[in-house]
UniProtKB/Swiss-Prot annotation:
<dbReference type="InterPro" id="IPR045291">
    <property type="entry name" value="Complex1_LYR_LYRM9"/>
</dbReference>
<dbReference type="InterPro" id="IPR008011">
    <property type="entry name" value="Complex1_LYR_dom"/>
</dbReference>
<comment type="similarity">
    <text>Belongs to the complex I LYR family. LYRM9 subfamily.</text>
</comment>
<dbReference type="InterPro" id="IPR052151">
    <property type="entry name" value="Complex_I_LYR"/>
</dbReference>
<protein>
    <recommendedName>
        <fullName>LYR motif-containing protein 9</fullName>
    </recommendedName>
</protein>
<dbReference type="Pfam" id="PF05347">
    <property type="entry name" value="Complex1_LYR"/>
</dbReference>
């Protein structure tokens, strides 16, 4: 089964814009006191990589961000 947050399936996240939307929707599944922190973290991550142009590097960043989001959501659920 493919995890779906909002209207975006995790497997469909292949562009920075879709990643941003996916991560923000993941933040909405966090406890109230953690939402602001992680939304700020997502924004900062995008600001720090906005000048990245190498498609291979962008895919590496997307893969790592998805792994991190899974880890955080699993941590909150336990």
């Amino acid at each position: 089964m493919v995890p779906i947050v909002g209207l975006i399936a995790k497997s469909a996240v292949n562009t920075p814009r879709l990643l941003y939307r996916y991560l923000f929707r993941c933040c909405d599944r966090l406890p109230e006191d953690a939402k602001g922190h992680y939304k700020h973290h997502v924004r900062q991550g995008f600001n720090s990589h906005e000048d990245e142009t190498d498609p291979e590097r962008i895919q590496q960043i997307i893969k790592k961000a998805l792994e991190d989001a899974d880890w955080i959501l699993n941590k909150v659920r336990s």
